[in-house]
Amino acid sequence: MNRCRALVAQQARAFAEQGYLCTLVDFFGTGDCDGDLVDATLAQWRDNLERTIETLLAEQDLPLVLWGLRLGALIALDYAAQSDRTVRDIVLWQPVTSGKIYINQVLRQRVASLMVRDLPPETTKEIRQRLADGEHVEIAGYTLAGALAADIEAIDTSRFTGLCSGTLHWLEHVVEEGKDIGIPSRKLVDQLGESHTVNVQTFNDPPIWQIHERDEAPQLLALSRELLA
């Protein structure tokens, strides 16, 4: 996600120009935050969010808007589902729809990396067992422990009700203009739509979260600015 930081910072500045107090959260063990990822838990990350929100609301009592990218989007939804705070809107960029699927994708990165480096192969099942046994696993330069992986996999999207009083904005990448969002996304959007106002928008900028080169996403930025104008 490091390659997304410049894009996220650019959008944060745009939100600030629109009058929002905007803070980017580095969760425990990530970015510039203290601690190591191997010691992180989802409970700590929820606490990071809560403390950040407390600080912002102490500065100025404004409506609360949550914004997240990929796993951060799923964590924002999870926080809103558990918090007693009133959230007005939630902005989701290319949201992860399942913690279990996300962890599977992360583990596959290790499988692919071992293959490319001609190292002894592992399967996702074997990596899961290592994590369950208390081992730490290196993936893409980060060290993952079983506790955080289990926490993320256990996020229960069926509890995602009463998340916000306003609109849940779902922004998702499509290969071609006019295409619908993916099937897993559509299922979760339909579920959320039973109890929320959901605004689905698509964009076809480069998928910055998965490409190696730094790039721009002008369509995504423009859509996001319009949402909270």
Task: Give residue spans per PLM region.
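Short beta-to-alpha linker loops that shape the active-site pocket of alpha/beta-hydrolase fold enzymes
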Residues: L21, D26-G31, V96, N204-P206
